[in-house]
């Protein structure tokens, strides 16, 4: 640090040098102009000057004034302003030096006491820890002794319990035997008593019959005399006849009651405590049962009411397709289009009569208007054609379908040529030039089908169309080169398709071959050898010398055996298009790999947008064949056009229906393509949400250096939450290639380039598939845009915000709206057509909508604080004086990724 001289200090405090030298001398510090000044000397000079010129003031007073304007309401709705001035005074007193020293000494003593207390606490804690350890040791010894005693007691109890259980079982067996003997004696006694009762009943009945025969004559004379007495007195006779009729009727009632009560008991619940009603109901039922014919009908007709139910609105069965216009929906329901538009407005959707609405919206509107809805799928014809097929029931093992992938010049073609030349049957017409993109080889352990596809284009395009044709991927890596960029791309494609990988380490016969280096490099990309605990087989081969080819084929068959590949051999065939082209003399030609069933010459096939009858079939040798089973590639002729690679091939029954399905698919192709383009847009990813599932943002990342790739990948993966996850489908160093674009199209991913650009072929794929391609040079911009896309996929948070409060002062009736509350707005603003709550004693008693809002008989949209208004609550009339009406609105708060 530079020393401060007297001259520089004088310049700093703006005083002459001679005067400053004199002041130093007066303070007892002799100095010259060029001498240095220390901080201690500055303090000494300052203290000298304070003593000489007087000390600093003991008090300091500060004053502050603030002015504001207050607006208060006046009469007539006007307001006036009042000026308010607030004055504040604050005095600061300098502390006495002796008092300061005393306070400092007290603070020092307090700190020392706290330190002493802390040291004592530490000592106490140590002693307590030692005592606690001793107690725990003693308790542990005691617990061990108790546990041993309990185990001994448990062993004794177990032995005694076994003896007790044996005694209990013996006692239970004896008890069951005694109970069975008692039950047998009781049954015999009941049978004897029943027999005696039946004999007594027969004896009484015989005596009654005999007495009736003996007294029959006496009873007849008495009845005759009684009839002559009745004729003498008409009134007595009439009353007696009436009583007899009533008695006879009562006997009928009593007789029928026992029969009808059981039948009506379950259907008619009986009320307790109302005996009169019960007996009356029983009497009515018994009389109805006793009368027959006309009486029963007359009773039913007399109880029938004359009121007839009014006719209901006609409920129709409405068939709705995937899309429908509002006008067509109205015609199907036989109502006016304005009624449908009104119903949609009630549901919160605005539409015109010619607007196309989706199936779900149309279903909601039709059901809201009381009609029954039947949903019709547009692809019913396609489903009917696909379901009308003969398929065999028994599945058999099939040959694996293998795709060979790898970097350029690593020996893919040489490996294929060697396998073809040694394993394919001799007599191939024209040699290699006759192959059709796929061939199969026969080995001692089984058959293998190889797809001879250039690069990864066909592999990825088939996966993009949903056709999983490949079972196993053979990754060819040169032992002298190791892992190269296209090797990494092949690994990413295989992982995205979830296909097992068998690694063929080629050029093993070269001197610079390093097998361990290849294993180490591949393990960094998730391809672990079996000897390292992974799942991938590493086979050293040489396509030039033929070393290890048989081991490679056996490894493929072993992997296929683990996968348990099976297919139905009989029935109509189905498969996938490997490649297709237009031949000048033969027309559209397609190479088909059969997956299930048997493809025969003359079958009618449906292939994507094309259809036709198989006029000819050729195998990979160029020979005519009549049929092809599972995992067999063939070349077929007879299609109406050239299909796309990866299209599904299906054999159907009817050529006419196949043509209709093909035309329907052509019409739907544009809609599907637009939907896929819209789905892959970064800004529209929030529209692809479904409640209750985890959303994914798929990214294909390319950067200029490996460090940038790793940094960006880590940053993107850290953005993942429980609701939205970032998935890196593929990443690498270098420009964006056609393979990257095809991978992004197959995975519905966005392409991100960091300091790199796309080549011409990649731009062509990006334009044709309308992929979302982003270029960045700043990593923070990349992270922010992906974070914004993820935030758009989060569902918004709904929040209720109270905007106004009104107090009910009076209630009056309106013929149009019912009860109208005369209110004074006490807080905020009351807005029309907003949801409200009615509060009574600070308790919510109703929640609904504000229907009418008036001020001085004029309809208004809002009423502000301090004004009176009339409020009509929709569908609610129980408004009382003193209630509070709370108006609120629901706002959506967009969530974001933190």
Swiss-Prot record:
Primary location group: cytoplasm
Chain residue ranges for the region called Disordered: 52-312
Binding site residues for GTP: 406-413, 452-456, 506-509
Extent of Polar residues compositional bias: 68-82
Biased composition (Basic residues): 258-274
Cellular localization per UniProt: Cytoplasm
Location of the region described as G5 in the Swiss-Prot/TrEMBL record: 542-544
Keyword set, alphabetical order: Cytoplasm, GTP-binding, Initiation factor, Nucleotide-binding, Protein biosynthesis
NCBIfam families to which the protein is assigned, alphabetical: IF-2, small_GTP
Name by which UniProt lists this protein: Translation initiation factor IF-2
Gene this protein is translated from: infB
